[in-house]
Regions:
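Short beta-strand scaffold segments in enzyme catalytic cores
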Residues: 38-47
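Intrinsically disordered, low-complexity tandem-repeat regions enriched in Proline and Serine
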Residues: 6-12
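Extended beta-strand/beta-hairpin segments
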Residues: 31-37
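Compact, glycine-rich, soluble single-domain proteins
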Residues: 56-72
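Feature captures the catalytic cores and cofactor-binding loops of soluble hydro-lyases/lyases
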Residues: 72, 76-80, 106-107
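C-terminal binding/interaction regions
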Residues: 2-3, 14-31, 82-145
């Protein structure tokens, strides 16, 4: 990380670090349980202390019960005591880098905060780095409760 980079004040866009995280998410993707859609997704969540939590999508015959890779990884992070989440990476075999669904965007914002880096990637090597607040502008959050 280079916190002195004016284009990356949080030091979250280091290409080598992103390559490593994308590789971890890609590895997690191979464990996807997707017998209905055959659409495998992998994810990794990084905590500020450097721990990594992987996830893959887990489908169900009752489609609404399907778990997205991002939510699996976030759930693992929280269940293992991680509270200061830094980055979320998601990858799939798509033409463009894969964005999280609306439910995942809401959970990423809630658990990782508005400035968390979110990396959208595909198997072709394309990627987009954004933030959770950019993915979910005008979000409903605890301040409305």
């Amino acid at each position: 990380m280079n916190p002195n980079d004016p284009n990356d004040p949080n030091g979250l866009n280091d290409p080598n670090e992103l390559d490593q995280l994308i590789a971890v998410a890609r590895e997690a993707r191979q464990f996807a349980y997707a017998p209905y859609s055959n659409f495998a997704v992998g994810a990794v969540v990084e905590s500020r202390d450097g721990r990594l939590f992987t996830g893959c999508n887990v489908e169900n015959a009752s489609y609404g019960l399907t778990l997205c890779a991002e939510r699996v990884a976030l759930g693992k992070a929280i269940s293992e005591g991680a509270r200061d989440l830094l980055r979320v990476v998601v990858i799939a075999d798509t033409r463009r880098p894969i964005p999280p669904c609306g439910a995942c965007r809401q959970l990423i914002l809630e658990l990782a905060g508005p400035e968390a880096a979110v990396v959208l990637a595909n198997l072709a090597g394309d990627r987009i780095v954004t933030t959770s607040s950019a993915l979910l502008p005008a979000a409903f959050d605890r301040h409305y409760l």
